[in-house]
Each structure stands twice: as C-alpha cells, then as structure tokens.
Design a protein with these regions (language model features):
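Core segments of cupin and vicinal oxygen chelate
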Residues: 11, 18-61, 114
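Active-site/binding-pocket entry motifs
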Residues: 59, 68-70
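N-terminal beta-strand motif that seeds the catalytic metal site of vicinal oxygen chelate
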Residues: 2-28, 80-83, 129-130
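Vicinal oxygen chelate
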Residues: 5-10, 13-22, 41-42, 51-56, 72-130, ...
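Acidic-residue sensor for enzyme active/binding pockets
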Residues: 61-63, 124
Length: 130
C-alpha cells in the first residue's frame, strides 16, 4: 500500500458522468440539438435504461439513466455542480441556445454562460482557447 503523500504509478482517466433523467427521449433530443451528442451505446436492464452519449471531439461520455420506478423529478439541490463544454463557435452556440430558450445564466465578464437540460442540470458553455 502506498504511503500517504507518495505518488503512485496508477493513472486515472475520467470516462463518464451520470445524470438521472425523467424522460430519456426528451433528454436525448435536447443533448443532440444543444450539444451535438449522440447515442454511443445502450444498456437495458431490469427496471432501468442507461444510454451513453458522446461525440467525436472526446472519449468522455455522459451517461443518462432512466429508472422505471422513479416517477418524481430528481432533487438537484442548489445546482452547484455542472459539466462544461468547450465550443469552437461560441456566438453560434449562444444563438442556438438562445433560440432553444435553455440559457439560465450568463457571465459576460468571464465570457461564459450556462444552459439547463430538461431535468434542470446545468451545463457550462465556454469558448475554445485560440
């Protein structure tokens, strides 16, 4: 066992984030339109469905989970967590999200804004560093 404070040779790679959703089709349509994410794979289990969505820009995936026996909306607390997306055409993305009516917070001083998905999860949009 490694000693506290010593660096080990283990390498960790982030591979996915999970969001529980109420309406899988609605969520998938939102992520496709808003962020260009599409279904990578699906697992249909006993009482649940997992759909992993992603794109060619990264190997990181978002796992959308639909639990069959969870009829009420999820309590997201104060939404102090979020997933960030870097976009190559910030102005076009902002225009699309404005048209979709999903922008929930803007911080022009920092050059960023946030959108919400159908379940209330916050997603940060930041411009590519050029």
């Amino acid at each position: 066992m490694p000693q506290a404070g010593k660096r080990s040779n283990m390498k960790f790679k982030m591979i996915h984030e999970n969001y529980n959703v109420m309406d899988l089709d609605k969520s998938m349509a939102f992520y496709e339109k808003a962020l260009g994410l599409h279904e990578v794979r699906r697992i249909n289990g006993d009482g649940f469905t997992l759909v992993y969505i992603g794109n060619e820009e990264s190997s990181f995936e978002l796992e959308l989970t639909k639990l069959d026996d969870h009829p009420q909306a999820y309590d997201l607390g104060e939404c102090e967590f979020h997933l960030a997306f870097e976009v190559d055409d910030y102005d076009a993305a902002h225009k699309l999200h404005e048209e979709m009516g999903c922008i929930c917070f803007e911080n022009p001083a920092m050059g960023i804004y946030f959108i919400t998905d159908p379940d209330g999860y916050w997603l940060e949009i930041i411009p590519s560093k050029k």
